[in-house]
Every structure is written in structure tokens, then in C-alpha cells.
Amino acid sequence: MKLPKSLKYLLLAPILMASLSSCGNNDSNLQVAVLGDAVVALPTITNIDYEKGLKKNKEMFGKFGCSGIGKVLDNGDMVVGRSFDLYYSNNPAYLIRTEVKDCYKTIGLSYNTFDGKTFKEIKEKGVSQDELLTLLFFTVDVMNEKGLYIEANMRDEQPESTGIKASTGTNPGAELSMSFPALVRYLGEKCADVNEAVEMAKTINVYGMITDEFAWGGGYFMADASGHYGVLELVDNKLIWSDNYNSQCNFYVNSEYKDKATIGSGLGRYYLLNSEIDSVESEEDMATLMKKVRYSQILDPRTCIFDPTSEVCGYGDAYNDFGGALTLEMCRSGKYKDEIIAMMDASKAKERQKTLQQLKDDGKEWESVWQTVANCNNKTLRVTFFEDDKLTFNFSF
């Protein structure tokens, strides 16, 4: 196949890509393209998740659904599970490889929509230079050749209710400034382990993604081949490190700001991950666990641990019904699991029915994007696109 002009240009750059071809099941709604080692996963605009086929709850629109958790297996391997979950999944997803002089090699996942929202559009137009260069600065999962893995999750913030300032810069005057997502690949190329990544991040002026209504902070879950892991969070113009913290969703976990978790989202996902992580003994187990926190599950009242509406404001109804006494530690320990489930089964029946109706009637869709299982010791990324569980890609150096 003839290479697009823009792709020929990039063969000269430190991004390893080759000719365009397609793979996957033609009967599925998921369209997949491969640019050499780069994967383009393109769900059609009308696609909904296979497993549940649920429409999105309109109250959820604009929320984030990403989750990540790590564990050192009995064989010593550091394994991280990650779901990249947004309220849309029509964006093309790319796997990017970089090999830059005096930097570590990386493999990472990115997405964008400049050149189209379907494989057909991109095949017809080619992949533009603008698209590919933008992807480099929105690589939200990265593994490098030393076994350092970093994944980025957004935080939901409402400054008017929390007093959290928009993160316009953590280190004004620093030689280097970059946005929250751009830091992921940069640290992967420059750092060999978690300690180096945390220290280097603090020398950079990192700023958040800001709109008129929200000041989005974020968190990076980092892990390396030594088994060291933790969460670095961007909040209030600060970078705060929580050492040996094993998971993140879309609320703050550091001790200084965790009381602001009620305006984030993901407590139900967080609870499920931590209540089952001890049973994870392999990469396959981790992949199975991550499937349980996809939004097609969380938004189905028959399968979620917390009422779906609780995801709108983090603790939501579960938090309020416990008189504000439900904490991250309680969810982590599973201490009140039976009480929470009983409460949801009984007192939340009407809310569940209302949510089911919204799921059926709302024209918008919630579509998961991808799931990653990273092995820091083998330096591998296993990527599954939620729209087709049987379509899995394994990447290594």
C-alpha cells in the first residue's frame, strides 16, 4: 500500500511506523488499523459496548471514568491494570513508539480526532503531520525500555465549591513548562524509575487543563521494575507524591486533599479494585479485574456496587446515607461492603429505576476506550479495546 505523504515524513522522525493495514473482525463495530507497530482503534460513531449495550446516563456526561491499580505478583513482576474510560470512544487510538537520541525507548497510547473519527476517513485522507505530532503530546500511557510505566487520570474539580485553584503552573520560572498529559511521555523518555520521574517532574512547570467552568487536576500512577509504585497528583499548583499508593480513579488520594474526593468520581470503581486486588495472581487476572470497572458495568445498576448516580459526585448517596462517615479507608478495607450493598438493594430502588430509564432514553452513549495491562519487568503492554474483548494487542521492545 502506498504510504501517505505525512507518514513518509514521520519515517524520518523518531517514531517507528510503517504502512497502513487493517485487522480485526469485519463483523464488529470496532474498526482497527495498524501503522506498522502503531495501532489505530476506531469504533464507529454509532457503536455501543458489546457486553451490555447500555446507553449513557445523561447525568454522567462530562465525567471521567479512568482507573488504575498496581500489584507486585508472587513471581516478583510489577503489574499494572489501567482502563482509559471517557464518555465517548469515537476518537482514534494510536500506539506510538519513540526512539529519541539520548532518551529511553518508549511505547505508549494516545488518541485524537484531527484526521477523522473512523478508519474509513483516515484511510481516505491519510494521517496528517499535525495529527501525529499532536499525538506525541497526548500520550496518556507509557512504558519505557527500563520498565518504568506511567498512566494519567484526570480529576474532577469545581473551584467554586472546593476552593481549589486552577493549576496554571507548579513551578513558575522553570526552564521547561508542559501540560498535564504531555508530561507522561517526557518522563518515560528521560527517567529510569519512579524516583527519577518524581524528582524530574518537580523541576518542570506543569499546568492543568483549564476551561471556563472547571480547573482539571490530574494524577499519574507510576510503577517500575523494582516494584516501587505510587501516585503523583497535580492539584492547587502543586505536585504531591503518595508513595506506595496502589491505585487511582478520578478523585484525590493524597492526605492533604483527599477530603475533596466528594467532588470527584470513581469511589465505586476504587472500592471494587481494592476489594479484589489480593486475588490477582497473573496478568490475565489483572485484565479480568479491569473489565469489572469499565463504565458499561458501573452504569448498570444490576452489576455496580454503588448506585450509578453516586458516580456523579464521588461519594454521592452512599456517602450521605452514612452521615458523611464513609471514608476511602472504609472502602479500601471493604468493612461496610454488606451494608452498602443492602442499602443499594433496598432504599435506592427508585433511583435505580430512574437511572435505567435514563440509560434507555438518552440518545448519547458511554463507550469505554481501552484497557491496558502493563508488566514493568517484561516491559510489555497488553492492550484490549473494550468494544471487542477478543481483539487484544501485545507490545514489547
Segments from the language model and where they lie:
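Bacterial N-terminal signal peptides that target proteins for export
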Residues: 1-10
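Outer/extracellular conduits and scaffolds centered on Gram-negative outer-membrane beta-barrels
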Residues: 11-15
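C-terminal, well-structured catalytic/ligand-binding subdomain of enzymes
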Residues: 27-126, 134-136, 141-142, 153-189, ...
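Aromatic- and glycine-enriched pocket-lining scaffold segments that form the walls
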Residues: 194, 198-231
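C-terminal motif of bacterial Sec signal peptides marking the signal peptidase cleavage site
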Residues: 19-22
